[in-house]
Curated annotation (Swiss-Prot):
Keywords: Cytoplasm, Methylation, Protein biosynthesis. Disulfide bonds: none annotated. It comes from the Bacteria. The gene is prfA. It comes from Streptococcus pyogenes serotype M1. It is found in: Cytoplasm. The modification N5-methylglutamine is found at residue 236. This is Peptide chain release factor 1.
Length: 359
């Protein structure tokens, strides 16, 4: 099937989806309605570009016809030639865009995410750097118009972050932040370093797509839920009523503790969101490991131990090791202006996928 047959098939399916989403039987089936709505949303940009492309093809045909008929009218002929030139350039641009749009879509790209950041090797300095990463993602979320909600956090004695779990909600969050999973290394002089030596520390980032209950159902028998009193600074109980929730997925041993909210039900709901995402991610990771060769052909959103980026403070430098990108803009990037890095990762991933399709 050539590219034009593929595009026509996508447009035909898009029109079929519009009809299905008006079908009362589909509307009453929540899971099917969500699946079809997501499929329609994922193909909308491709269909819009294809329809615009067909208009450009028609414009080229009309301009060529006009040139034939413009004999004796140099002004009309010149105008038609200019339109033909512009339309042919637009045609090439649309063809490149459509090739990318036809690449297999990641079904999670439009989803919200659960973001986890942990201080790793480097003690207090690693925890402080984890806090810097949290601020970077919060500010980037602001620039994108996303909602950023810290769901659970644990700090150390110097104000750094041992661990933080956040929900980031908005348009296409996963598509932009999915490349952030991995080990982030920092090189800088700690405030406690009297000799001015540069220390290296690490923080880890994990990005998981939010998983709706209708998409991934956890059997209640597979969960152990403990209720206990929330503790404040110094470990004292801060609530007379037990509101904190500890949830364990027995088959995998995955555990979530939640005590940020004032009510047990809210803590239970948040814990369920996180554990559903972690369990789904756990099994998705197993499946992804079985397709190791395929994963290595792209940017790499799978290997959680992979050192993906280095932040060098003395040189104001950020290096993404996966794509060989180096920018002397560390201060800018940590302030939340991440577009240059993320756009480069997306472009690299798309290019690699195009190459693998052509081979």
């Amino acid at each position: 099937m050539n590219i034009y047959d593929q595009l026509q098939a996508v447009e035909d399916r898009y029109e079929e989806l519009g009809e299905l989403l008006s079908d009362p039987d589909v509307v009453s089936d929540t899971k099917r309605f969500m699946e079809l709505s997501r499929e329609e949303a994922n193909t909308r940009e491709t269909v819009t570009a294809y329809r615009e492309y067909k208009q450009v093809i028609q414009t080229i045909s009309d301009a060529e016809e006009m040139i034939k008929d413009a004999s004796g009218d140099p002004e009309l002929e010149e105008m038609a030639k200019e339109e033909l030139k512009e339309s042919k350039a637009a045609k090439e641009e649309y063809e490149e865009k459509l090739k990318i749009l036809l690449l297999p879509k990641d079904p999670n790209d439009d989803k919200n995410i659960i973001l986890e950041i942990r201080g790793a090797a480097g003690g207090d300095e690693a925890a402080l750097f984890a806090g810097d990463l949290l601020t970077m993602y919060q500010k980037y979320a602001e620039t994108q118009g996303w909602r950023f909600e810290v769901m659970e956090s644990s700090v150390n004695g110097v104000g750094g972050i041992k661990e933080v779990v956040a929900m980031v909600s908005g348009q296409s969050v996963y598509s932009k932040l999915k490349y952030e999973s991995g080990a982030h290394r920092v090189q800088r002089v700690p405030v406690t370093e009297s000799q001015g030596r540069v220390h290296t520390s690490t923080a880890t980032v994990l990005v998981m797509p939010e998983v709706e209950e209708v998409e991934y159902d956890i059997d209640p028998k597979d969960l152990r839920v403990d209720i206990y009193h929330a503790s404040g600074a110094g470990g004292q109980n801060v609530n007379k009523v037990a509101t904190a929730v500890r949830m364990v997925h027995i088959p995998t041993g995955i555990k979530v503790e939640m005590q940020e909210e004032r009510t047990q039900q809210k803590n239970r709901d948040k814990a369920m969101k996180i554990i559903r995402a972690r369990v789904a991610d756990h099994f998705a990771q197993i499946a992804q490991d079985e397709q190791d060769a395929e994963r290595k052909s792209t940017v790499g959103t799978g290997d959680r131990s992979e050192r993906i980026r280095t932040y060098n403070f003395p040189q104001n430098r950020v290096t993404d090791h996966r794509i060989g990108l180096t920018l002397q803009k560390l201060d800018t990037i940590l302030s939340g202006k991440m577009d240059e890095v993320i756009d480069a990762l997306v472009m690299y991933d798309q290019t690699k996928k195009l190459e693998s399709l052509n081979n």
